[in-house]
Amino acid sequence: MIKFITLQNLMDYQVTLKLMEDYVNKVINYNEPEIVYLVEHSEVYTAGTNYKQEELLNYGDIPVIYTGRGGKFTFHGPGQRVIYPILNLALPNRHKDLKLYIKMLEEWIINSLNYFGIKGYLIKDKVGIWIKVSKGEFAKIAAIGVRVRKWITYHGVAINISTDLCKFNGIIPCGLESSLVTSLNQLGIYVEMFEFDKIIQTEFNKIFK
């Protein structure tokens, strides 16, 4: 079973990024076991490799970090569970297929949300997990941005639990001007982070065996 490591307190993004990159190197060079980091970041905007500078609107005093993950701008902060699976897609029980890996991440998060009575949706040409908030209108509850090096995965998924959604006003989230964001709290689901973590670990082990 893959080990989950919960990093306590609010984590600086760059500190966490170095932690991830160092562990990826250990997996590549020393065959270290797969792990999953569970993180809650201090406030930060991060940009993926497909970002456009005009999508950064008004970041104020929140730091902006340009990363190597896929995707565009997003926000990380308190009340958001960020999950960084470091998996080896070259193992015999895995597949060297990035699209399949992302599909498995999507299935994992949708199944986890379903536990709380929330139906998650996938929208064509829009990465992430979406919630139907009104007729024909969807809001994003989880962002996905990954990177792979020598078939070792890092970066991952960010799920809004009790996130201050106003912070997303400083960017065009994921480059989608008309997109809304939501959280478990906004949907009327109030859950402690450790309780949410139990569910995502259970659902993870059903998909990533």
From Swiss-Prot:
Additional detail: In the reaction, the free carboxyl group of octanoic acid is attached via an amide linkage to the epsilon-amino group of a specific lysine residue of lipoyl domains of lipoate-dependent enzymes.
Give GO MF terms, alphabetically.
Answer: lipoyl(octanoyl) transferase activity
Q: Which GO terms describe its cellular component?
A: cytoplasm
Say which family it is in: Belongs to the LipB family.
Annotated pathway: Protein modification; protein lipoylation via endogenous pathway; protein N(6)-(lipoyl)lysine from octanoyl-[acyl-carrier-protein]: step 1/2
Q: Does the keyword Transferase apply?
A: yes
Function, as annotated: Catalyzes the transfer of endogenously produced octanoic acid from octanoyl-acyl-carrier-protein onto the lipoyl domains of lipoate-dependent enzymes. Lipoyl-ACP can also act as a substrate although octanoyl-ACP is likely to be the physiological substrate.
Key words, A-Z: Acyltransferase, Cytoplasm, Transferase
**Listed GO biological process terms:** protein modification process
Give the E.C. number(s): 2.3.1.181
Q: Where is this site: Lowers pKa of active site Cys?
A: K140
Q: What is this protein called?
A: Octanoyltransferase
